[in-house]
């Protein structure tokens, strides 16, 4: 399966992507230069046609900022983001407009992402009216109803408002809005974290079904490692704005190489109570460093159980193969 993915067309190519924010503290004198918060600091990867890339990491590691930088909701500081060979970071507004019909986003809070003053029919139809203004009202209505059926919503609910729906239904509305233009890539920014567990499974299964039917590529961001394993072809592990491990889901989950990934995977619950009782969880010592003042060299070295003197001097880079790559001076990716 993964060998087949590698042979497919590259949709998205990201090289050394950086997103930095200038931070000015209240007690800082005006002549002092602002401090820099490094939210994303040098992520490189490729996304292939029809692939699902899972992105995991603890809160504050830069997952959502990374996703928003791809679609232009956050301005990138440096690096390259190429969509079908076109550099997105240097695009003008009219060129971006064309690309955005191919790249859509599903947000974390389903209700907050919907306009409370608009009916769900108007919400789902808004991208159509923006990109296809010549469509008749009946054509727009027909397409909206067809998309509602596709995501599991009854068309006779078209004139209702977001507050009349449950969280899972609101997320389906958000999915319908993202898919109405038939994009090639959907960025899912923790789309199930605000939902009940039973509803999470329904939304994940719906995304997989729509991916098969429409040939979508997905970037799926989540905290729940079990959900990411279920839906992903490859998994990217982020820590403090850096990519520390990237590989197929079976390699990352069953043969993690980076110490941070090993700690994450050791915390995944096991259904068997006997195995769960005897499982050893690898605890990380210390606090997550500040992205304003990250450690020198390897950013994980202050919490790493195998760090050496060289880890403070040299910053590791992601090395390895398509199946498995790791960013660690102490680990051989081969």
From Swiss-Prot:
GO molecular function: ATP binding; ATP hydrolysis activity
Compartments where located: Cell inner membrane
Keywords, comma-separated and alphabetical: ATP-binding, Cell inner membrane, Cell membrane, Membrane, Nucleotide-binding, Peptide transport, Protein transport, Translocase, Transport
Induction: Part of the opp operon, which is constitutively expressed.
Highest taxon, organism lineage: Bacteria
Cysteines engaged in disulfide bonds, as pairs: none
Gene Ontology CC: one annotated term: plasma membrane
Known catalytic reactions: a [peptide](out) + ATP + H2O = a [peptide](in) + ADP + phosphate + H(+); L-alanyl-gamma-D-glutamyl-meso-2,6-diaminopimelate(out) + ATP + H2O = L-alanyl-gamma-D-glutamyl-meso-2,6-diaminopimelate(in) + ADP + phosphate + H(+)
InterPro entries: AAA+_ATPase, ABC_transp_ATP-bind, ABC_transporter-like_ATP-bd, ABC_transporter-like_CS, Oligopep_ABC_C, P-loop_NTPase
SUPFAM superfamilies, sorted: P-loop containing nucleoside triphosphate hydrolases (SSF52540)
Pfam families in UniProt: ABC_tran, oligo_HPY
Membrane-related topology note: Peripheral membrane protein
Enzyme Commission identifier(s): 7.4.2.6
Major enzyme class: translocase
Boundaries of every ABC transporter domain copy: 12-265
Oligomeric and partner information: The complex is composed of two ATP-binding proteins (OppD and OppF), two transmembrane proteins (OppB and OppC) and a solute-binding protein (OppA).
Family: Belongs to the ABC transporter superfamily.
Role summary: Part of the ABC transporter complex OppABCDF involved in the uptake of oligopeptides, including the cell wall murein tripeptide L-alanyl-gamma-D-glutamyl-meso-diaminopimelate. Probably responsible for energy coupling to the transport system. Plays an important nutritional role and is involved in the recycling of cell wall peptides.
NCBIfam families: oligo_HPY (TIGR01727), PRK11308.1 (NF008453), PRK15079.1 (NF011659)
Protein name: Oligopeptide transport ATP-binding protein OppF
Gene field: oppF
């Amino acid at each position: 399966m993964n060998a087949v993915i590698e042979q497919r067309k590259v949709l998205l190519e990201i090289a050394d992507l950086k997103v930095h924010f200038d931070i000015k503290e209240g007690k800082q004198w005006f002549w002092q230069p602002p401090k820099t918060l490094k939210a994303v600091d040098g992520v490189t990867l490729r996304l292939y046609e029809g692939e699902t890339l899972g992105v995991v990491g603890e809160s504050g590691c830069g997952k959502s900022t990374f996703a928003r930088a791809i679609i232009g909701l956050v301005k990138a500081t440096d690096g390259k983001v190429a969509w079908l060979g076109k550099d997105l970071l240097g695009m003008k507004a009219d060129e971006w407009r064309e690309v955005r019909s191919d790249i859509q986003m599903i947000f974390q809070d389903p209700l907050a992402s919907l306009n409370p003053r608009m009916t769900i029919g108007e919400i789902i139809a808004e991208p159509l009216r923006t990109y296809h203004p010549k469509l008749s009202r009946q054509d727009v209505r027909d397409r909206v109803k067809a998309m509602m059926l596709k995501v599991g919503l009854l068309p006779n609910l078209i004139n209702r408002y977001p507050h009349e729906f449950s969280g899972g239904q609101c997320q389906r509305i958000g999915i319908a809005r993202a898919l109405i233009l038939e994009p090639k890539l959907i960025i899912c920014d923790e789309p199930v974290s605000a939902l009940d567990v039973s509803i999470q499974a329904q939304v994940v299964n719906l995304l997989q079904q729509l991916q098969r039917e429409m040939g979508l590529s997905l970037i799926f961001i989540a905290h729940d490692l079990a959900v990411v394993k279920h839906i992903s072809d490859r998994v990217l592990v982020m820590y403090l704005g850096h990519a520390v491990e990237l590989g197929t889901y079976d390699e990352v989950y069953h043969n993690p190489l980076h110490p941070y990934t090993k700690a994450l995977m050791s915390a995944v619950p096991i259904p068997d109570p006997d195995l769960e009782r005897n499982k050893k969880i690898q605890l990380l010592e210390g606090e997550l460093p500040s992205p304003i003042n990250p450690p020198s060299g390897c950013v994980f070295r202050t919490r790493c159980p195998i760090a050496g003197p060289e880890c403070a001097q040299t910053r590791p880079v992601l090395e390895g193969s398509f199946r498995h790559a790791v960013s660690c001076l102490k680990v051989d990716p081969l």
